[in-house]
């Protein structure tokens, strides 16, 4: 099963992606990790990407898409894959769609997690880290994992907030890109939605990202089949 996963920062997309990975035995591939791996290994395409990054420029699609395709063709992708974090524009969606089809890896499913922008922002700003274990879930805006004051709900350890989780300008900037239905990430998602509505060659799934993690998972698994 070959899946594209869309969702704003704060939607719980990463959590659901990990669940899909385990249930369907496919890798959860994050586009940023592909860049980091190629750059750290010093691959030729990684070196080219690094030149743009070091100049503060966007890496062109002519480099990004072949890099992504290379990862999607790795041995661990025999059962499929879940790609997260790309594309981020309609133009990139068109190019990726064409490249996947040419490589014989046409998409099976596109998932869009839907969440109100303010709720997504609150979830990011509400995240708290436990001094004993960062994997202990605590969020002052999510009732199911709301801590007891400034103490971890799991172990009672002291909690703190990551500085980047409190940077409203940075959060707003990321969300501006994601929620832009004309040129941003949602525009790329809607490109695939139009294909699904036109000929059904790809399955387009929408998920309500507001309920609890188990509830969202149940909806996702039910729709994936």
UniProtKB/Swiss-Prot annotation:
Record NCBIfam families: adk, PRK14529.1
Q: Which GO terms describe its molecular function?
A: adenylate kinase activity; ATP binding
List the CDD domains: ADK
Subcellular locations according to the entry: Cytoplasm
Q: Where does this protein hold AMP?
A: 31, 36, 57-59, 85-88, 92, 162, 174
Give the start-end ranges of region LID: 126-165
One GO process term, biological-process aspect: AMP salvage
Q: Where is this region: NMP?
A: 30-59
Q: How does it assemble?
A: Monomer.
Recorded hits in Pfam families, A to Z, give: ADK
Gene source species: Desulfatibacillum aliphaticivorans
Q: Which PROSITE patterns match?
A: ADENYLATE_KINASE
Enzyme Commission number, as recorded: 2.7.4.3
Keywords noted in UniProt: ATP-binding, Cytoplasm, Kinase, Nucleotide biosynthesis, Nucleotide-binding, Transferase
| Gene3D superfamilies the UniProt entry points to | P-loop containing nucleotide triphosphate hydrolases (3.40.50.300)
Could you identify this protein by its name?
Answer: Adenylate kinase
Q: Which reaction does it catalyse?
A: AMP + ATP = 2 ADP
Q: Which family does it belong to?
A: Belongs to the adenylate kinase family.
Entry function: Catalyzes the reversible transfer of the terminal phosphate group between ATP and AMP. Plays an important role in cellular energy homeostasis and in adenine nucleotide metabolism.
Give the domain note.
Consists of three domains, a large central CORE domain and two small peripheral domains, NMPbind and LID, which undergo movements during catalysis. The LID domain closes over the site of phosphoryl transfer upon ATP binding. Assembling and dissambling the active center during each catalytic cycle provides an effective means to prevent ATP hydrolysis.
Q: What would be the name of the gene that encodes this protein?
A: adk
């Amino acid at each position: 099963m070959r899946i594209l996963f869309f969702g704003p920062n704060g939607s719980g997309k990463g959590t659901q992606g990990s669940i899909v990975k385990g249930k369907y035995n496919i890798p959860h591939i994050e586009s940023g990790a592909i860049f980091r791996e190629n750059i750290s290994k010093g691959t030729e395409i990684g070196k080219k990407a690094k030149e743009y990054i070091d100049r503060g420029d966007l890496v062109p699609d002519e480099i990004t898409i072949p890099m992504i395709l290379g990862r999607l063709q790795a041995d661990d992708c025999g059962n499929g894959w879940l790609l997260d974090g790309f594309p981020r524009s309609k133009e990139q969606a068109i190019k990726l769609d064409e490249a996947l089809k040419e490589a014989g890896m046409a998409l099976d499913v596109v998932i869009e997690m839907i969440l109100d922008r303010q709720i997504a922002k609150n979830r990011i700003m509400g995240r708290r880290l436990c001094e004993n274990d960062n994997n202990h879930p605590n969020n002052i805006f999510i009732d199911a994992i709301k801590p007891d004051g400034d103490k971890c709900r799991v172990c009672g350890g002291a909690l703190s907030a990551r500085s980047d989780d409190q940077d409203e300008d940075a959060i707003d900037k990321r969300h501006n890109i994601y929620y832009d239905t004309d040129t941003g990430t949602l525009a790329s998602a809607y490109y695939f939605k139009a294909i699904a509505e036109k000929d059904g060659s790809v399955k387009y799934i929408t998920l309500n990202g507001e309920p609890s993690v188990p509830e969202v998972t149940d909806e996702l698994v039910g729709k994936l089949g």
